[in-house]
A protein has these predicted regions:
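Internal, well-ordered alpha/beta segment that forms a basic, Gly-enriched binding/recognition surface
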Residues: 117-176
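Glycine-rich, proline-tolerant flexible connector loops at the mouths of alpha/beta enzymes
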Residues: 60-75
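Catalytic domains of carbohydrate-active enzymes, especially glycoside hydrolases
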Residues: 40-59, 84, 124
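Histidine-acidic metal/acid-base catalytic patches
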Residues: 17-23, 30-33, 38, 46-49, ...
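A short glycine/small-residue-enriched secondary-structure motif
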Residues: 50-54, 86-101
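N-terminal amphipathic/basic-hydrophobic helices that include classical n-h-c signal peptides
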Residues: 1-25
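Asp-box/BNR beta-propeller blade signature and adjacent active/binding-site loops
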Residues: 83-87, 116
């Protein structure tokens, strides 16, 4: 069997950095990674190395969904990252096509292409793959610049505005049945003063700006995004939670042999938000869902991306309890937090606040499964970020602040655990 080339080690990737949290205690800590959108990203790898990033989370965004990632393309990306003294730590994402999710006629062909891409990644020494099994909508927010009161802004989800989009713009059949009477009353009030500009903003925020850069279903170049979105939703007519689960199990069982051969860790991202939306089934939203997914395919390579932000957006989720339960099957950690407001709206919170309890999460993962790749995920727009045209949620200064906060938490937790050097 052909062996994979030796990828850059974490030690090699941080040799020139004065303070490496990875090795401060002589043992592995959470690896500080950063989601980077390729060479066209305005945030360069040189910038990331200067702020202490050790590993890169990225994808081959130029390859259409469902096409094979060639070994040559993978190697080119890996070597480019390694030239900047970091490593390609996680693929986020190798997209799972909608046809695989709803069980279309071409799913076996698409799964075979997925397997080839996985094998090529394994041959090139890239072994952690974040993906999602959310139908149509990768993640949802209604406001991308919600003011925080200190000059910064964060992502926000309003149930009423989302319901307005569903009932008044998308005009989904039977949509009203999915909302409370209070929410529908608010939708009617909004309909009296919402302008065409307001409606355009909602469309952009919900199905364009948050989607085009992550899965390509709808992009800013599409002239009729609402019509495209309706056609995508129609693909899931008749697909309930049990059928989507069966399709996920089918996919995972098909790819596990190559994952075992090349030690590929698949880590599913939780539903974001972990709530019923648009009548679509959701299968990674709570404790019971995660337990089902891991037990349905009990292979160690079938694991979880522990996204604290997504999970904390559901008031039903006790995030630290989930971390304790599933740390051993977690392959990748997203650290961010949310505040759930009365009525169920939620706002992305500071990494030092909110209901995710990030300090406790670091304690849990450092104690149970140290060495996992971690990224700080979304962060506020601040210090001119809003002028740079960054992808929604992925600011530079906001994430840099969050990374510094989390790095301080990591060092403090190691001191608490009694393993940090004294004096």
């Amino acid at each position: 069997m052909e062996s994979a080339p030796k990828p850059i080690s974490r030690a090699e990737g941080v040799q020139s950095y004065t303070y490496s949290s990875t090795f401060i205690t002589g043992r592995l800590m959470l690896e500080k990674t950063w989601r980077w959108f390729g060479r066209q990203d305005k945030i360069t790898l040189d910038m990331l190395r200067q702020i202490g990033v050790e590993g890169i989370v990225t994808a081959l965004h130029h390859i259409p969904n469902g096409e094979v990632w060639s070994r040559e393309d993978i190697r080119s990306m890996r070597e480019y990252i390694e030239q900047h003294h970091m490593r390609w730590s996680v693929v986020e994402s190798l997209p799972v096509c909608e046809s695989i999710k709803y069980g279309g006629k071409d799913r076996d062909e698409l799964i075979e292409k997925y397997i080839i891409s996985l094998e090529n990644l394994g041959r090139e020494g890239v072994h952690t793959i974040c993906y999602n099994f959310m139908p149509v909508l990768d993640w949802a927010r209604t406001d991308l610049t919600h003011p925080n009161g200190d000059g910064t802004s964060s992502l926000y989800f309003s149930h009423a505005e989302f319901a307005y989009f569903d009932c008044k713009i998308l005009k989904r059949k039977g949509a009203e049945a999915g909302y409370t009477a209070e929410t529908l009353e608010e939708v009617e009030r909004m309909s009296h003063h919402f302008t065409a500009e307001d409606e355009h903003r909602l469309v952009e925020n919900i199905i364009v700006k948050t989607q085009g850069f992550v899965n390509g279903n709808i992009t800013e170049h599409d002239e009729r995004p609402v019509e495209i979105f309706r056609s995508l939703l129609a693909l899931y007519d008749g697909i309930d939670k049990e059928q989507l689960r069966a399709n996920m199990k089918y996919f995972l069982e098909a790819i596990m042999p190559v994952c075992n051969r090349w030690e590929m860790n698949m880590c599913v991202h939780p539903d974001d938000p972990p709530l019923q939306i648009l009548g679509l089934p959701r299968i990674v939203s709570c404790d019971q869902d995660i337990e089902w997914m891991l037990n349905a395919v009990p292979d160690k390579h079938n694991g979880l991306t522990f996204c604290a932000g997504s999970l904390s957006a559901g008031a039903h989720n006790d995030v630290p309890a989930l971390a304790r339960k599933y740390a051993g099957r977690t392959h990748f950690v997203h650290l961010r937090s949310t505040n759930v407001l009365p009525g169920g709206d939620f706002k992305e919170a500071s990494h030092l606040g909110g209901r995710a309890h990030i300090i406790e999460l670091v304690r849990i993962f450092q104690s149970i499964n140290p060495g996992l790749p971690m990224r700080v995920d979304h962060a506020p727009l601040m210090l001119g970020d809003e002028k740079m045209g960054y992808n929604a949620g992925y600011s530079f200064h906001g994430r840099m602040l969050a990374l510094g906060q989390v790095e301080g938490i990591m060092a403090t937790v190691d001191d608490e655990l009694g393993i940090a050097p004294k004096g």
